[in-house]
Amino acid sequence: MRSICWIALFLSLATFATAQTKIDSWNEFAKTKFEPKYYEKMGEYLFYPNFTKELKALEGKEITVQGFYVPFAPEDGDYIIISKFPMSQCYFCGGGGPESVAEINFSKTPGKFQVDDLITVKGKLKLNADDMEHVNFILDDAVLVSK
């Protein structure tokens, strides 16, 4: 009986610890504040991110993000974009901003996706504040968890 109590205690603590490390990626991304700065290359003002301390602490760590596939054809074709919102909600028309999209660099090609496929990916978070050719939230070495 005593060993059953210890096992139950251990399992409940393990479950609690796992729950504590799970994050809502989109919610964390949404805490990012943006400020306009002049971007010389384009000759106009663009919004640059000020990442939170909590988000900076996640950089380089593996996170999971679930989002909708956005049809985007980069010239080199080695990454995809997912959004918190489906295209049918027109994420770029006002409901979402730069905090609602993530760039996914797969470790191996996962196959083809259709517009608004809801996918879950896992990868190492990279925060991008300066390269305007890419989005602010990037998952490197990503793998497809579910489609």
Task: State where each predicted segment sits.
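OB-fold and OB-like single-stranded nucleic-acid-recognition modules
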Residues: 19-147
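Sec-dependent N-terminal signal peptides
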Residues: 4-14
